[in-house]
């Protein structure tokens, strides 16, 4: 069953919530497609080689066509020369974007939440707000929950809470409207506000 642990203000277990049964029935392939698309979208397009059009020099024929006994050559910048161009090499103009439609994106999130809930790794709380904006207070929350790392899902993300969690390498804070299947899958635990959970399940 896809059950969510409900925690009180002292982060003690005070009950359970249940995700819609349809979440666990989603085809896992939707999660695969979305994660593949997400990773492709954030891929750094850094591999770049120069074709003959972009290598400087080589405009002059290095030697006459006939009479030397050697192979003919028209430029010092062809791909067979040291310092020459690269034939069919990668360029930073390549676009790795892979389209995933809204329905698949939604189904991927539903399945990711169902799997996480089945593992008992989703915790619902009334509110996660750090008025001080201090990382120390954010770290205490994670310590009290006794989790290795966590995705924090707020219904409405505020600057102070974002600031407090930003310096914690094992945490990431996201708005309910921005949460996605990749983030849910990446972190071992999900801490979600009840209002945020209502927002997410309402969209399904």
Swiss-Prot record:
<comment type="function">
    <text>Forms part of the polypeptide exit tunnel.</text>
</comment>
<dbReference type="GO" id="GO:0003735">
    <property type="term" value="F:structural constituent of ribosome"/>
</dbReference>
<dbReference type="GO" id="GO:0019843">
    <property type="term" value="F:rRNA binding"/>
</dbReference>
<dbReference type="InterPro" id="IPR002136">
    <property type="entry name" value="Ribosomal_uL4"/>
</dbReference>
<dbReference type="GO" id="GO:0006412">
    <property type="term" value="P:translation"/>
</dbReference>
<comment type="similarity">
    <text>Belongs to the universal ribosomal protein uL4 family.</text>
</comment>
<dbReference type="Pfam" id="PF00573">
    <property type="entry name" value="Ribosomal_L4"/>
</dbReference>
<keyword id="KW-0687">Ribonucleoprotein</keyword>
<comment type="function">
    <text>One of the primary rRNA binding proteins, this protein initially binds near the 5'-end of the 23S rRNA. It is important during the early stages of 50S assembly. It makes multiple contacts with different domains of the 23S rRNA in the assembled 50S subunit and ribosome.</text>
</comment>
<dbReference type="InterPro" id="IPR023574">
    <property type="entry name" value="Ribosomal_uL4_dom_sf"/>
</dbReference>
<comment type="subunit">
    <text>Part of the 50S ribosomal subunit.</text>
</comment>
<feature type="region of interest" description="Disordered">
    <location>
        <begin position="53"/>
        <end position="73"/>
    </location>
</feature>
<keyword id="KW-0694">RNA-binding</keyword>
<protein>
    <recommendedName>
        <fullName>Large ribosomal subunit protein uL4</fullName>
    </recommendedName>
</protein>
<dbReference type="InterPro" id="IPR013005">
    <property type="entry name" value="Ribosomal_uL4-like"/>
</dbReference>
<keyword id="KW-0699">rRNA-binding</keyword>
<keyword id="KW-0689">Ribosomal protein</keyword>
<dbReference type="GO" id="GO:0005840">
    <property type="term" value="C:ribosome"/>
</dbReference>
<dbReference type="GO" id="GO:1990904">
    <property type="term" value="C:ribonucleoprotein complex"/>
</dbReference>
């Amino acid at each position: 069953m896809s059950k969510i642990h409900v925690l009180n203000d002292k982060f003690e277990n005070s009950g359970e919530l249940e995700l819609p049964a349809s979440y666990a029935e989603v085809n896992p392939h939707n999660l695969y497609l979305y994660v593949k698309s997400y990773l492709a979208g954030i891929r750094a397009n850094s591999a770049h080689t120069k074709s003959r059009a972009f290598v400087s020099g080589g405009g002059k024929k290095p030697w006459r066509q006939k009479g030397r006994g050697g192979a003919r050559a028209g430029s010092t910048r062809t791909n067979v020369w040291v310092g020459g161009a690269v034939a069919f090499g990668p360029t930073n103009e390549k676009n790795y974007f892979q389209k995933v439609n809204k329905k698949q994106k939604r189904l991927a999130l539903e399945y990711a939440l169902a799997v996480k809930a089945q593992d008992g790794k989703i915790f619902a709380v009334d509110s996660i707000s750090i008025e001080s904006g201090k990382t120390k207070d954010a770290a205490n929350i994670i310590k009290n929950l006794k989790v290795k790392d966590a995705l924090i899902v707020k219904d409405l993300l505020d600057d102070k809470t974002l600031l407090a969690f930003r310096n914690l390498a094992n945490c990431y804070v996201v708005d309910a409207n921005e949460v996605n299947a990749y983030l849910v899958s990446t972190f071992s635990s999900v801490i979600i506000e009840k209002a945020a959970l209502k927002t997410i399940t309402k969209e399904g």
